[in-house]
From Swiss-Prot:
Gene Ontology molecular functions: L-lactate dehydrogenase activity
Family membership: Belongs to the LDH/MDH superfamily. LDH family.
Gene name as annotated: ldhb
PANTHER family (UniProt xref): L-2-HYDROXYCARBOXYLATE DEHYDROGENASE (NAD(P)(+)) (PTHR43128), L-LACTATE DEHYDROGENASE B CHAIN (PTHR43128:SF2)
Protein name in the entry: L-lactate dehydrogenase B chain
Pathway recorded for this protein: Fermentation; pyruvate fermentation to lactate; (S)-lactate from pyruvate: step 1/1
Naturally occurring in which organism (per UniProt): Anguilla rostrata
Keyword Cytoplasm tagged: yes
Oligomer and partners: Homotetramer.
Pfam families, A to Z: Ldh_1_C, Ldh_1_N
Cellular-component GO terms for this entry: cytoplasm
UniProt enzyme class: oxidoreductase
Chain positions recorded as NAD(+) binding sites: 29-57, 99, 138
Protein backbone atom coordinates (compact mmCIF):
# COMPACT_ATOMS: atom_id res chain seq x y z
CA UNK A 1 0.00 0.00 0.00
CA UNK A 2 1.35 3.41 -0.96
CA UNK A 3 2.30 5.82 1.84
CA UNK A 4 0.96 9.33 2.21
CA UNK A 5 4.22 10.69 0.83
CA UNK A 6 4.11 8.36 -2.19
CA UNK A 7 0.52 9.39 -2.90
CA UNK A 8 1.31 13.07 -2.49
CA UNK A 9 4.62 13.47 -4.31
CA UNK A 10 5.93 12.10 -7.61
CA UNK A 11 9.76 12.29 -7.70
CA UNK A 12 11.35 13.40 -10.97
CA UNK A 13 15.05 13.12 -10.09
CA UNK A 14 17.06 11.00 -7.71
CA UNK A 15 18.18 12.34 -4.38
CA UNK A 16 19.13 15.81 -3.14
CA UNK A 17 21.65 17.94 -5.01
CA UNK A 18 24.93 19.11 -3.47
CA UNK A 19 24.57 22.46 -1.70
CA UNK A 20 25.87 25.48 -3.60
CA UNK A 21 26.28 27.90 -0.71
CA UNK A 22 26.88 25.74 2.34
CA UNK A 23 28.32 27.47 5.38
CA UNK A 24 29.75 25.64 8.39
CA UNK A 25 30.26 27.26 11.78
CA UNK A 26 32.74 25.49 14.06
CA UNK A 27 31.99 26.27 17.70
CA UNK A 28 28.46 26.90 18.97
CA UNK A 29 29.32 29.26 21.81
CA UNK A 30 28.04 32.83 22.00
CA UNK A 31 30.14 34.02 19.05
CA UNK A 32 29.49 30.98 16.87
CA UNK A 33 25.73 31.19 17.28
CA UNK A 34 25.73 34.95 16.67
CA UNK A 35 27.60 34.26 13.41
CA UNK A 36 25.16 31.47 12.50
CA UNK A 37 22.04 33.53 13.18
CA UNK A 38 23.44 36.59 11.38
CA UNK A 39 24.23 34.46 8.31
CA UNK A 40 20.75 32.89 8.41
CA UNK A 41 19.03 36.27 8.68
CA UNK A 42 20.93 37.52 5.63
CA UNK A 43 19.70 34.50 3.64
CA UNK A 44 23.22 33.65 2.46
CA UNK A 45 23.34 29.86 2.84
CA UNK A 46 21.31 27.03 1.33
CA UNK A 47 22.68 24.77 4.07
CA UNK A 48 24.08 25.56 7.50
CA UNK A 49 26.19 23.05 9.44
CA UNK A 50 27.23 23.40 13.08
CA UNK A 51 30.15 21.53 14.64
CA UNK A 52 31.18 21.36 18.30
CA UNK A 53 32.49 18.87 20.84
CA UNK A 54 29.68 19.42 23.37
CA UNK A 55 26.94 17.17 21.95
CA UNK A 56 23.95 18.27 24.05
CA UNK A 57 24.58 21.96 23.47
CA UNK A 58 25.16 21.30 19.76
CA UNK A 59 21.94 19.32 19.34
CA UNK A 60 19.98 21.90 21.31
CA UNK A 61 21.21 24.78 19.15
CA UNK A 62 20.47 22.83 15.98
CA UNK A 63 16.92 21.98 17.09
CA UNK A 64 16.25 25.54 18.19
CA UNK A 65 17.23 26.86 14.75
CA UNK A 66 15.37 24.09 12.91
CA UNK A 67 12.19 25.00 14.79
CA UNK A 68 12.47 28.47 13.28
CA UNK A 69 12.77 27.14 9.71
CA UNK A 70 9.41 28.62 8.73
CA UNK A 71 10.91 32.08 9.25
CA UNK A 72 14.17 31.39 7.39
CA UNK A 73 15.24 30.84 3.79
CA UNK A 74 17.88 28.22 4.61
CA UNK A 75 16.29 24.86 3.87
CA UNK A 76 18.73 22.60 5.68
CA UNK A 77 20.28 23.04 9.13
CA UNK A 78 22.43 20.18 10.42
CA UNK A 79 24.87 19.58 13.27
CA UNK A 80 27.29 16.92 14.47
CA UNK A 81 30.52 16.55 16.40
CA UNK A 82 31.84 14.60 13.39
CA UNK A 83 33.29 16.91 10.75
CA UNK A 84 31.74 14.88 7.92
CA UNK A 85 28.64 17.03 8.51
CA UNK A 86 30.64 19.99 7.15
CA UNK A 87 31.40 18.31 3.79
CA UNK A 88 31.22 20.47 0.66
CA UNK A 89 31.18 23.79 2.50
CA UNK A 90 31.95 26.95 0.56
CA UNK A 91 32.79 28.86 3.72
CA UNK A 92 33.85 27.52 7.11
CA UNK A 93 33.74 29.98 10.00
CA UNK A 94 35.99 28.97 12.90
CA UNK A 95 34.92 30.37 16.28
CA UNK A 96 36.05 27.47 18.47
CA UNK A 97 38.55 28.01 21.24
CA UNK A 98 38.88 28.93 24.87
CA UNK A 99 37.09 32.10 25.90
CA UNK A 100 38.78 35.44 26.37
CA UNK A 101 39.01 36.25 30.09
CA UNK A 102 38.29 39.66 31.56
CA UNK A 103 41.44 41.77 31.44
CA UNK A 104 43.38 39.15 29.46
CA UNK A 105 45.34 40.30 26.41
CA UNK A 106 44.32 38.51 23.24
CA UNK A 107 47.93 37.51 22.71
CA UNK A 108 47.92 35.50 25.95
CA UNK A 109 45.28 33.24 24.45
CA UNK A 110 47.51 31.86 21.72
CA UNK A 111 49.03 28.78 23.21
CA UNK A 112 45.75 27.69 24.79
CA UNK A 113 44.08 27.73 21.39
CA UNK A 114 46.80 26.32 19.12
CA UNK A 115 46.36 22.76 20.38
CA UNK A 116 42.62 22.91 19.71
CA UNK A 117 43.26 24.04 16.13
CA UNK A 118 45.55 21.07 15.49
CA UNK A 119 42.45 18.87 15.67
CA UNK A 120 39.97 21.19 13.98
CA UNK A 121 41.70 22.47 10.85
CA UNK A 122 42.83 19.18 9.23
CA UNK A 123 39.29 17.82 9.66
CA UNK A 124 37.75 20.84 7.94
CA UNK A 125 40.11 20.58 4.97
CA UNK A 126 39.56 16.82 4.70
CA UNK A 127 35.83 17.30 4.04
CA UNK A 128 35.87 20.72 2.32
CA UNK A 129 39.19 21.01 0.44
CA UNK A 130 37.88 23.86 -1.71
CA UNK A 131 36.46 25.99 1.10
CA UNK A 132 37.36 29.49 2.22
CA UNK A 133 38.33 29.50 5.90
CA UNK A 134 37.26 32.50 7.96
CA UNK A 135 38.95 32.52 11.37
CA UNK A 136 37.24 34.42 14.18
CA UNK A 137 38.79 32.87 17.31
CA UNK A 138 41.13 35.15 19.24
CA UNK A 139 43.88 36.16 19.00
CA UNK A 140 42.62 36.14 15.44
CA UNK A 141 45.76 37.22 13.56
CA UNK A 142 48.03 34.57 15.07
CA UNK A 143 45.35 31.88 14.83
CA UNK A 144 44.75 32.74 11.17
CA UNK A 145 48.47 32.18 10.59
CA UNK A 146 48.20 28.89 12.53
CA UNK A 147 45.19 27.90 10.40
CA UNK A 148 47.07 28.69 7.18
CA UNK A 149 50.01 26.54 8.30
CA UNK A 150 47.85 23.62 9.46
CA UNK A 151 45.48 23.68 6.49
CA UNK A 152 47.94 23.71 3.60
CA UNK A 153 45.47 25.95 1.75
CA UNK A 154 46.66 28.88 -0.38
CA UNK A 155 46.92 32.10 1.60
CA UNK A 156 44.09 33.83 -0.28
CA UNK A 157 41.63 31.21 1.03
CA UNK A 158 42.54 31.63 4.70
CA UNK A 159 41.13 34.88 6.07
CA UNK A 160 40.94 36.32 9.57
CA UNK A 161 37.97 38.47 10.63
CA UNK A 162 40.72 40.90 11.62
CA UNK A 163 39.87 44.57 12.05
CA UNK A 164 36.57 44.45 10.16
CA UNK A 165 34.90 44.85 13.57
CA UNK A 166 37.48 47.34 14.90
CA UNK A 167 36.84 49.51 11.83
CA UNK A 168 33.08 49.22 12.33
CA UNK A 169 33.47 50.32 15.96
CA UNK A 170 35.70 53.20 14.86
CA UNK A 171 33.23 54.35 12.22
CA UNK A 172 30.36 54.17 14.70
CA UNK A 173 32.18 56.16 17.40
CA UNK A 174 33.47 58.81 14.99
CA UNK A 175 30.09 59.14 13.28
CA UNK A 176 28.31 59.48 16.63
CA UNK A 177 30.60 62.38 17.50
CA UNK A 178 29.93 63.98 14.10
CA UNK A 179 26.17 63.39 14.21
CA UNK A 180 26.06 61.26 11.05
CA UNK A 181 25.39 57.61 10.20
CA UNK A 182 28.38 55.28 10.58
CA UNK A 183 28.23 54.34 6.88
CA UNK A 184 28.87 58.00 5.99
CA UNK A 185 32.15 58.16 7.91
CA UNK A 186 35.05 56.57 6.06
CA UNK A 187 37.84 55.35 8.28
CA UNK A 188 40.09 52.33 8.60
CA UNK A 189 41.66 50.43 11.46
CA UNK A 190 44.50 48.20 10.23
CA UNK A 191 47.13 45.93 11.75
CA UNK A 192 46.41 43.67 14.70
CA UNK A 193 42.85 43.12 15.84
CA UNK A 194 42.78 44.58 19.31
CA UNK A 195 45.52 46.03 21.45
CA UNK A 196 48.01 47.29 18.84
CA UNK A 197 45.59 48.17 16.02
CA UNK A 198 46.50 51.11 13.79
CA UNK A 199 44.02 53.93 13.08
CA UNK A 200 44.60 55.45 9.64
CA UNK A 201 43.91 59.08 10.54
CA UNK A 202 45.48 60.22 7.27
CA UNK A 203 42.59 58.65 5.36
CA UNK A 204 39.66 59.53 7.64
CA UNK A 205 37.06 61.44 5.66
CA UNK A 206 33.41 62.37 5.32
CA UNK A 207 32.01 62.77 1.79
CA UNK A 208 35.57 63.01 0.49
CA UNK A 209 36.54 65.75 2.95
CA UNK A 210 39.77 64.67 4.66
CA UNK A 211 39.57 65.36 8.40
CA UNK A 212 43.35 65.74 8.67
CA UNK A 213 43.16 68.72 6.32
CA UNK A 214 40.60 70.33 8.62
CA UNK A 215 42.64 69.49 11.72
CA UNK A 216 46.31 68.59 11.00
CA UNK A 217 46.72 67.35 14.60
CA UNK A 218 43.78 64.91 14.51
CA UNK A 219 44.60 61.63 16.19
CA UNK A 220 47.78 62.97 17.83
CA UNK A 221 48.56 64.03 21.39
CA UNK A 222 48.64 67.66 20.18
CA UNK A 223 44.98 67.50 19.13
CA UNK A 224 42.97 69.75 21.46
CA UNK A 225 39.73 68.04 20.43
CA UNK A 226 41.04 64.62 21.56
CA UNK A 227 39.79 62.69 18.54
CA UNK A 228 42.30 59.97 19.39
CA UNK A 229 39.96 58.98 22.23
CA UNK A 230 37.78 57.34 19.57
CA UNK A 231 40.54 54.84 18.78
CA UNK A 232 41.24 54.36 22.48
CA UNK A 233 37.57 53.46 22.91
CA UNK A 234 37.79 51.01 20.00
CA UNK A 235 40.65 49.19 21.75
CA UNK A 236 38.93 49.21 25.14
CA UNK A 237 35.38 48.52 23.98
CA UNK A 238 35.66 44.73 23.79
CA UNK A 239 37.02 44.60 27.34
CA UNK A 240 34.22 46.91 28.48
CA UNK A 241 31.50 44.77 26.91
CA UNK A 242 33.07 41.65 28.44
CA UNK A 243 33.11 43.37 31.84
CA UNK A 244 29.44 44.29 31.50
CA UNK A 245 27.90 41.15 29.97
CA UNK A 246 30.63 38.51 30.14
CA UNK A 247 31.41 38.19 26.43
CA UNK A 248 31.05 39.90 23.04
CA UNK A 249 29.00 38.26 20.32
CA UNK A 250 26.45 40.32 18.38
CA UNK A 251 28.76 42.82 16.68
CA UNK A 252 31.27 40.14 15.66
CA UNK A 253 28.43 37.95 14.39
CA UNK A 254 27.14 40.77 12.20
CA UNK A 255 30.69 41.51 11.04
CA UNK A 256 31.28 37.89 9.98
CA UNK A 257 27.95 37.76 8.12
CA UNK A 258 29.04 40.91 6.28
CA UNK A 259 32.23 39.14 5.17
CA UNK A 260 30.30 35.99 4.25
CA UNK A 261 27.97 38.00 2.02
CA UNK A 262 30.88 39.51 0.09
CA UNK A 263 32.49 36.09 -0.36
CA UNK A 264 29.34 34.19 -1.35
CA UNK A 265 27.92 36.86 -3.64
CA UNK A 266 31.28 37.60 -5.31
CA UNK A 267 30.85 41.31 -4.54
CA UNK A 268 34.50 42.47 -4.75
CA UNK A 269 33.91 44.72 -1.74
CA UNK A 270 36.86 45.97 0.27
CA UNK A 271 37.14 44.88 3.90
CA UNK A 272 39.90 45.27 6.48
CA UNK A 273 40.60 41.58 7.11
CA UNK A 274 43.62 39.62 8.23
CA UNK A 275 45.77 38.37 5.36
CA UNK A 276 49.38 37.36 4.76
CA UNK A 277 51.34 40.63 4.67
CA UNK A 278 54.91 39.44 4.12
CA UNK A 279 56.56 41.76 1.60
CA UNK A 280 54.12 44.63 2.17
CA UNK A 281 55.06 47.91 3.91
CA UNK A 282 58.53 46.55 4.60
CA UNK A 283 57.28 43.59 6.67
CA UNK A 284 59.67 40.67 6.23
CA UNK A 285 58.06 37.97 8.39
CA UNK A 286 55.16 35.62 7.66
CA UNK A 287 52.45 37.29 9.67
CA UNK A 288 48.75 37.85 9.18
CA UNK A 289 47.57 41.43 9.70
CA UNK A 290 44.58 43.41 8.51
CA UNK A 291 44.86 45.47 5.35
CA UNK A 292 42.09 46.62 2.98
CA UNK A 293 41.37 43.48 0.95
CA UNK A 294 39.18 43.01 -2.11
CA UNK A 295 37.08 39.92 -1.34
CA UNK A 296 35.18 37.76 -3.81
CA UNK A 297 34.17 34.12 -4.21
CA UNK A 298 37.84 33.10 -4.44
CA UNK A 299 38.77 34.68 -1.11
CA UNK A 300 41.23 37.58 -0.95
CA UNK A 301 41.50 38.70 -4.56
CA UNK A 302 43.87 41.63 -3.97
CA UNK A 303 45.12 44.13 -1.40
CA UNK A 304 44.69 47.89 -1.71
CA UNK A 305 47.99 49.76 -1.29
CA UNK A 306 46.95 52.55 1.04
CA UNK A 307 49.00 55.74 1.14
CA UNK A 308 50.07 55.62 4.77
CA UNK A 309 52.19 58.08 6.73
CA UNK A 310 55.61 57.04 8.04
CA UNK A 311 54.13 56.89 11.54
CA UNK A 312 51.29 54.59 10.42
CA UNK A 313 53.73 52.29 8.60
CA UNK A 314 55.92 52.19 11.73
CA UNK A 315 52.90 51.18 13.83
CA UNK A 316 52.02 48.47 11.31
CA UNK A 317 55.58 47.09 11.48
CA UNK A 318 55.42 47.18 15.28
CA UNK A 319 52.21 45.11 15.13
CA UNK A 320 53.96 42.63 12.84
CA UNK A 321 56.97 42.39 15.15
CA UNK A 322 54.71 41.78 18.17
CA UNK A 323 52.89 38.94 16.44
CA UNK A 324 56.05 37.38 15.00
CA UNK A 325 57.56 37.40 18.47
CA UNK A 326 54.84 34.95 19.50
CA UNK A 327 54.55 32.96 16.26
CA UNK A 328 58.23 32.09 16.00
CA UNK A 329 58.00 30.12 19.26
CA UNK A 330 54.93 28.07 18.31
CA UNK A 331 55.54 24.34 18.06
CA UNK A 332 54.24 21.64 15.67
CA UNK A 333 53.12 23.86 12.81
Amino acid sequence: MASVMQKLITPLCSGPQRPRNKVTVVGVGQVGMACAVSILMRELADELALVDVIEDKLKGEMMDLQHGSLFLKTSKIVADKDYSVSANSRIVVVTAGVRHREGESRLNLVQRNVNIFKHIIPQIVKYSPDCILVVVSNPVDVLTYVTWKLSGLPKHRVIGSGTNLDSARFRYLMAEKLGIHSSSFNGWILGEHGDSSVPVWSGANVAGVNLQKLNPDIGTDADKENWKDAHKMVVESAYEVIRLKGYTNWAIGLSVADLAETLIKNLNRIHPVSTMVKGMYGIGDEVYLSLPCVLNNGGVNSVVNMTLTDEEIAQLKKSADTLWGIQKDLKDL
